[in-house]
């Protein structure tokens, strides 16, 4: 959603359940379970990097990062995103999920995620390891932001979105986690928040199917790694 605000575009949204089954969306995607999903005409993007590129189809370089920036993006999305769930107490996480999903929804969500992570290769951090990882990440952002308003330079960009997301999630679960963050990081978070979500319009599945029918195309060529 923040990418929409960054791009300053109008878009439409259909709400789906946090976990499968998701009815119509499952039928369209043929079983791919990741959300959010971006639709442009007949094309559906289930990878956030590809989705951001699709929003900027006239400039495919928007997600091309230097080696240091790519390492920071990978750190944010692979380690820190999961670490923020271990920084706060399990009771706080359950309370957050209950407010979002209801008690029955929490049971379904935990059962779904347990099944999904059964064959995962991620290293699960202890609470202390997670706290240390997040602290190091925040400190690194502070150093980066001392040189420019945004991680991407003078204006916010793809790298800012990637690093903002896990910290936003942490604040959604428990806003107290942000209390020890240095002011320079907190101010950056506020600037990112101020981007908003663009102009959100109502839409139905009928319109989504209409867009598919009106924008049929043939995909040619080889899909590049890692997609």
Spans of features found by a protein language model:
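Short, hydrophobic secondary-structure boundary micro-motifs
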Residues: 63-65, 153, 201
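Cytosolic, positively charged, low-complexity intrinsically disordered regions immediately flanking transmembrane
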Residues: 193-214
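General structural signal for secondary-structure boundaries
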Residues: 17, 101, 123-126, 203-210
């Amino acid at each position: 959603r923040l990418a929409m605000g960054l791009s300053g575009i109008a878009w439409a949204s259909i709400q789906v359940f946090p976990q499968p089954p998701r009815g119509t969306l499952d039928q369209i995607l043929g079983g791919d379970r990741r959300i959010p999903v971006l639709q442009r005409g007949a094309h559906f993007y289930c990878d956030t990097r590809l989705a951001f590129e699709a929003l900027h189809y006239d400039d495919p370089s928007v997600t091309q990062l230097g080696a240091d920036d790519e390492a920071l993006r990978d750190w944010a999305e692979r380690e820190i995103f999961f670490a923020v769930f271990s920084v706060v107490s399990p009771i706080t996480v359950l309370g957050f999920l209950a407010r979002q999903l209801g008690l029955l929804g929490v049971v379904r969500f935990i059962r779904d995620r347990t099944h999904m992570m059964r064959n995962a290769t991620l290293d699960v951090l202890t609470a202390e390891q997670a706290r240390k990882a997040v602290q190091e990440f925040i400190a690194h952002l502070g150093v980066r932001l001392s040189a420019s308003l945004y991680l991407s330079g003078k204006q916010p960009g793809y790298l800012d979105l990637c690093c903002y997301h896990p910290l936003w999630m942490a604040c959604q679960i428990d806003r107290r986690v942000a209390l020890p963050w240095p002011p320079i990081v907190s101010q950056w978070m506020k600037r990112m928040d101020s981007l908003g979500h663009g102009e959100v319009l109502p839409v139905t599945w009928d319109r989504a199917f209409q867009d598919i029918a009106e924008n049929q195309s043939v995909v040619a060529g080889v899909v590049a790694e890692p997609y």
